[in-house]
Design a protein with these regions (language model features):
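Helix-loop-strand module that forms the ligand-binding subsite of alpha/beta enzymes
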Residues: 1-66
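Glycine-rich phosphate/pyrophosphate-binding loop and the adjoining helix
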Residues: 64-125
Length: 125
């Protein structure tokens, strides 16, 4: 899931998506597992202000509550600190770091997805 940082929080669109995904809590598959079980999720954040880690934690926490598995370091972000600034496409600063953490995120998501595919989480009880 991706979101810009707005006032140190996820965007209203990201929040609405999470609110709609909340309906997944009551849905189960044919084995009685929540439909988000055995699926992985990660977070991408952009913005020209501080608060990326807060946005990552809010979105990751919501996705985990819904049932997704969140691997360690399943996030990346790019920002240039507090206040207005250039757009990502207009600025090279910070891109290498964002790309590196993005590759780590992809590797971790793939590794956990493969592990869950080989050994899925079972229904409670």
């Amino acid at each position: 899931m991706a979101s810009p940082t707005w006032l140190g929080r996820p965007s209203s669109v990201a929040q609405r998506v999470l609110e709609r995904m909340d309906a997944l809590l009551s849905e189960t598959d044919d084995q009685g597992r929540p439909v988000a079980y055995n699926r992985v999720a990660g977070v991408v954040v952009t913005g020209n202000e501080d608060g990326a880690h807060h946005v990552i934690s809010e979105i990751s926490g919501a996705l985990a509550d819904i049932g997704f598995t969140i691997p360690g370091q399943a996030w990346t972000y790019w920002h240039l600190g507090p206040g207005p600034g250039p757009d990502y496409l207009d600025e090279r600063k910070g891109r290498d770091w964002a790309h590196s953490t993005g590759r780590t995120m992809a590797d971790n998501l793939l590794g956990v997805a493969r592990a869950l595919s080989e050994r899925p989480l079972q229904a409670a009880g």
